[in-house]
């Protein structure tokens, strides 16, 4: 299969599987424990049916939305994710160039492999800096100060990762940063020489947001170790309220799953929340973001911008979430597999296909703008939600 033959998420995933060494593919593809929540994230959309209207005159369709005061050309964005230069040597640079062409939102992670200054200075799309709450309070402040100097518009604090999820695929392969593998994991690298050539013939792998604060040269640190040893499980609402005040700008919490927490986010002055279970990579057995979306929108949707991610593979998934009241919908694996498959060209094709699906499905729904979508367009198969 070639990139031009890729028509959907499954195709990008298959191309990525062929190109990547097994441990790296499984880092993207894997989730926590039995991966129940990971599967549930996508299955939740199948429990919801779309109800279209016809004869509405849909020659022109406007996909644009406003999110936390930022204008996006379409209601789908690329969620900030870690370690992207492991998947393709251009990493965040490739994603940023693709996103810039499509006028949507993207951001650098504190576990990103390109500096937030480089992305912020070279691209004009709405940019997010996604970070974690560390035990070192000085590090937290330094990250916010750095983001402010770089011109980042939205700070996004991930709040569902105070310790690492039990990602058993990574445990089996020995996946870590720097790479430290089991014998089986090393064999997986040996049979994917193209990836190795690209990885070792380009610039050194770095975590530029952390390298001034975290010494990883002395030994390998698994992602689970990073979450467990570096992040602060004592983080509470007072800590976050102080950070919101210090930032004095648009602040978003990623990983909100309950109505109570959504209301607290409003109370401390957040501009947005992302209803998310971290792609099923943290607490296995938790609900899907889509299943939680309606009650959270009902509680706070008129006071704060509610976004959602998790299991999004299709434009129809995005429309279902928008119909429930989400302002925009994010995804990680959707574009990461495309990045791994073909770099910038892969991400551009993934975003192109998503935009085509959104435009086509909007017309088939009888809607000319996102604001026309509502719960009148939905029916749920399950009687209990």
Where are these regions (language model features)?
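Short, conserved glycine- and acidic-residue-centered signature motifs
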Residues: 92, 286-289, 347
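Alpha/beta enzyme core
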Residues: 83, 97, 118, 122, ...
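An N-cap/entry alpha-helix motif that binds or orients negatively charged groups
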Residues: 1-69, 175-235, 371-385
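Alpha/beta catalytic cores of nucleotide-metabolism and tRNA/nucleoside-modifying enzymes
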Residues: 1-46, 291-308, 312-385
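Glycine-rich active-site/cofactor-binding loop and its immediate structural neighborhood
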Residues: 72-111, 116
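Active-site-adjacent beta-strand anchor residues
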Residues: 31, 109, 130, 255, ...
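Short, conserved beta-strand segments within well-ordered enzyme catalytic domains
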Residues: 49, 64-66, 75-79, 105-107, ...
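A gly/proline- and charged-residue-enriched helix-loop-helix capping module
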Residues: 101-122, 126-140
